[in-house]
Amino acid sequence: MATIEVDLAPIVEGQEITLKWRGNPVFIRHRTTKEIELAKSVKMEELKDPIARSANVKEGEPATDENRVVGSKENFLVMMGVCTHLGCVPFGNQGDYGVVEGHATSGGWFCPCHGSHYDTAGRIRRGPAPENLFVPKYEYLTDTKILIG
């Protein structure tokens, strides 16, 4: 399986980067404290897909915010940037489930193809997508470097 090493140090809080891995986009977001708090405040029964969909936890684990990140590094969220409905690429900092301050939204994703909304942990909240955005296998090599794959 192909791997890719990523340096997280240049990604500032509130910023998201997109990179290509195995021919698909991967979103890496340095989440704000408010984005993390919002994700943790969601009750499991409110989720359309209650399964974590993460290669880093056992299959079937609940979609808690803790199960969507690796270890105690909750500020970085790594996910495949492919909508689980029909494979479009969602837009970041959009949708109805991010942190809204004034007229700006931070965190959250919106798929423009058919209207799926994902929250600040990449969990499907509304729209036709059946599952949460998938979290690929990754590990921390250092405090600021990860290996995906």
Regions found by a protein language model. Name each.
Residues 44-149:
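Rieske [2Fe-2S] iron-sulfur-binding domain
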